[in-house]
């Protein structure tokens, strides 16, 4: 008889519970299989004689996880209520401010002409186009972020438990439609009350319908996810709907059949939308158990990355989260990259490949080109302020969409450092692809502005002189440093932020605000002069020099640090 101690038993004497291993002794190398005799598992010291309880329900597991998180959070119920109150108040105040601004803008807009001018677009048609674009953007975002996912700790523990997965995933499945419904209601109410001057029961029905349609869109994405449809296909479907919005606007302008008013939704339509949303919600709930763990982990990871980027005001990380969520794992067509003849051309070719493979950024370029065109063909928006805002937003969208290669290089600079190129030269080469993209955008956007203000060739010439500013601003924003978290923090509804975060976020847009002054003045005066074009060329040169700088800090800050170092050295 050979005695076997329990694991962790430090006593040298034999345990009374023994196992008959046969006549042969057991050496240090372990017994041979033939020497082991039959034994009862109840006598095995590694398997205790314990009573097995019932498997807990999914709801109890969720509650246990929540209690454990609260126990280690270090926050009281009062602080939680304070945070919720602050967040809700901030959201309500923000919506009211936006609603007030849009209402003032709607009152300041000139009335529509009594007879619709050929080639124009009515304000109700513009609202319909914007809502269609919002539906496409929502579907694309839902596809990229899941929409149902499990965060890292939940995916590691919950998904492996022998319980009904439906009960574990119900809160995550309900979170997306609820957030989309709130956002959809806010957008529809702002557009209806601000631009179309709707009020009363009509506004209430429109807000409810907007909330239900937004929830239906997210639920459709969840149904597709439960049926094994790849997230990339859902995102591509949303991108196609988003591209269809400017196409519909162009078709309305060319045909001249633009509606003068949108039909007011009835209570029957609202009830029908609610029934559809309820049926889709029941279908999603019934299929939650069929969701594969891989898609849940990918969706949860992308959503966590996106939320962290929004809270930290990092647009680059947000773009990576949205792009990586629907990136293709392989490509059917492989380019031979014949344009890569050296380090410089290889860098430019890589940026072109990144832009070509990102459908989201190609769609962003198309939408950016349509904004100034829409602003010039809508009679109520064809004003100085409307055209200026459309050019500003559209130009920044086009430049930012084409600088994805620079943003990836900022995250992983090892490839750039392997090239025999100076850091300044690398940043200037990164401006080539944004410059080409903005050049194409300029021909369309500034051509439309030229038709609106007169002398299209002069406006296109001014826009070509401003192309380097857009490219330099996009590259400067891509290479901006991360906020310094060792500085004093400022409490905000979204959490604590360092004091210099706004200064970091402003890197890139600051060049657009300053170095495009001739373009802004020309739009304000509705004319282009030789002095404006000359000044724009000079400021474009300055923008390229600033955008290619490798210093993370500004000139004034560097001078102050040098003075401090001199004082310390003199002391």
What are these regions (language model features)?
Residues 2-9, 13, 17-19, 27-155, ...:
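Hydrophobic alpha-helical transmembrane segments of membrane proteins
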């Amino acid at each position: 008889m050979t005695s076997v101690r329990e694991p962790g038993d430090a006593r040298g004497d034999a345990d009374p519970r023994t196992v008959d291993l046969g006549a042969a002794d057991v050496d240090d190398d372990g017994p041979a299989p033939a020497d082991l005799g039959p034994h009862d598992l109840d006598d095995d010291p590694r398997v205790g004689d314990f009573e097995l309880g019932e498997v807990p329900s999914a709801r109890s597991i969720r509650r246990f996880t929540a209690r454990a998180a609260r126990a280690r959070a270090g926050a009281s119920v009062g602080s939680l209520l304070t945070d919720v109150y602050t967040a809700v108040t901030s959201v309500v105040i923000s919506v009211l401010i936006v609603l007030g601004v849009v209402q003032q803008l709607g009152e300041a807009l000139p009335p529509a002409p009594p007879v619709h001018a050929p080639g124009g677009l009515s304000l109700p048609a513009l609202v319909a186009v914007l809502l269609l674009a919002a539906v496409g953007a929502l579907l694309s975002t839902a596809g990229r972020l899941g929409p149902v996912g499990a965060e890292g700790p939940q995916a590691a523990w919950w998904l492996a438990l022998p319980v009904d997965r439906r009960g574990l995933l119900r809160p995550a499945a309900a979170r997306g439609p609820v957030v989309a419904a709130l956002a959809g209601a806010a957008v529809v109410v702002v557009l209806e009350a601000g631009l179309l001057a709707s009020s009363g029961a009509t506004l209430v029905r429109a807000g409810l319908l907007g909330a239900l349609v937004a929830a239906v869109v997210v639920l459709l994405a969840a149904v597709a996810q439960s049926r094994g449809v790849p997230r990339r296909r859902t995102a591509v479907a949303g991108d196609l709907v988003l591209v269809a919005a400017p196409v519909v606007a162009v078709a309305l302008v060319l045909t001249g059949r633009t509606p003068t008013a949108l039909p007011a939704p009835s209570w029957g339509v609202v009830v029908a939308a609610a029934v559809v949303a309820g049926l889709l919600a029941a279908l999603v709930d019934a299929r939650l158990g069929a969701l594969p763990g891989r898609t849940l982990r990918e969706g949860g990871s992308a959503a966590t990355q996106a939320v962290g980027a929004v809270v930290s005001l990092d647009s680059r990380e947000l773009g990576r989260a949205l792009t990586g969520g629907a990136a293709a794992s392989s490509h059917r067509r492989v380019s031979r990259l014949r344009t890569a003849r050296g380090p410089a051309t290889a860098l430019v070719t890589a940026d072109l490949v990144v832009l070509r493979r990102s459908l989201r950024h190609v769609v962003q370029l198309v939408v950016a080109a349509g904004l100034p065109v829409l602003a010039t063909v809508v009679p109520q928006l064809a004003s100085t302020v409307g055209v200026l805002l459309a050019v500003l937003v559209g130009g920044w969208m086009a430049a930012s969409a084409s600088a994805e290669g620079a943003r990836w290089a900022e995250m992983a600079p090892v490839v750039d450092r392997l090239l025999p190129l100076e850091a300044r030269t690398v940043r200037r080469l990164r401006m080539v692809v944004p410059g080409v993209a903005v050049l194409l955008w300029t021909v369309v956007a500034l051509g439309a502005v030229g038709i609106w203000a007169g002398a299209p060739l002069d406006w296109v010439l001014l826009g070509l002189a401003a192309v380097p500013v857009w490219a330099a601003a996009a590259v400067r924003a891509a290479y901006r440093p991360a906020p310094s978290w060792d500085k004093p923090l400022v409490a905000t509804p979204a959490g604590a932020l360092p004091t210099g975060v706004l200064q970091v976020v402003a890197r890139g847009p600051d060049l657009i605000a300053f170095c495009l002054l001739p373009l802004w003045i020309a739009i304000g005066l509705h004319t282009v002069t030789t002095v404006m074009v000359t000044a724009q060329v000079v400021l474009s040169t300055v923008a390229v020099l600033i955008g290619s700088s490798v210093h993370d800090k500004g000139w004034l800050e560097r001078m102050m640090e040098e003075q401090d170092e001199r004082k310390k050295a003199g002391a």
